[in-house]
Amino acid sequence: MNNDYDVIIVGSGITGGWAAKEFCERGFNTLVIERGRNVDHRGPEYKDFQAPWDLQNRGMPEETLAENGHYATLRKKGHLYKTDALHFFVDDKKHPYSYPENKPFMWTRGYQLGGRSLTWGRQVLRWSPMDFEANAKDGHGIEWPIGYEDLAPWYSYVEKFIGVSANKDGLKTLPDGEFQTPWEMSYAEQYISNNIAKKYTDRHLIIGRAANLTSPTEEQTALGRGKCLARSYCRRGCSFGAYFSSQSATLPAAHKTGNLT
């Protein structure tokens, strides 16, 4: 085993995975250290092929967990508090943290390979020029040392790799990017969007910009990623690799170089 590394990265979540990909593709011998357990992509910890009746209590956690104070932070986010995804989150009773009484903080963590990249919401929104200029115009803090124009090519670089499904909406407050086929709105969503457009010129209801593949590129399929089937089981892990995570995208890209340990 080679113990000489050019780069050592602590953590394999979204940031760590990206760092590993970029360093490995530039020829650096890279070591990634993860505090949590290994989670194999498409392995048994992914529950996306299990039917409701295959899950413990059909996905509802046991009442004793709440009674004994387990997963307090996660219980406040009810949509994630399910047995099919509980193992991807940290139990804050076992790993407590503190914060000032007047500044409560909900720290959602995942201690495993891929970290929170397995459970993030996948909404990918660019900052607009307004976001970079707002504090200077409002007189708060200091001006940003960079502007939107500096980041725009890097936004594009990331979007092309991860795959973002969205419309080009032409909004000043939300710049368009490198998008794949957008999801269609439901009839109810379209009805609301149309009525907002009739009554307001400065308010918009748009389809989300999600890091779920709808038209995979050759680069993405070469990594083993497939098209999203819209099953709404994302929190269980995606065996198709359709949503962006360290397991589905950046770490496989890093492994392909032969420079990752």
Language-model segments: which ranges?
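Core beta-strand elements of the Rossmann-like FAD/NAD(P) dinucleotide-binding domain
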Residues: N2-Y5
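N-terminal Rossmann-like FAD-binding beta1-loop-alpha1 element of flavoenzymes
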Residues: V7-V32
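Glycine-rich, histidine-containing beta strand-loop boundary motifs that form or position
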Residues: S12, E34-G36, G43, R122, ...
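Short glycine-/acidic-enriched loop or helix-start segments at secondary-structure transitions
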Residues: A19, R42-G43, T217
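Glycine-rich FAD pyrophosphate-binding loop
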Residues: C24-Y46
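Short, hinge-like loop/turn segments at secondary-structure boundaries
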Residues: D48-A51, G224
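Conserved redox-cofactor binding core of oxidoreductases
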Residues: Q56-D91, P96-M106, Y111-Q112, W120-R126, ...
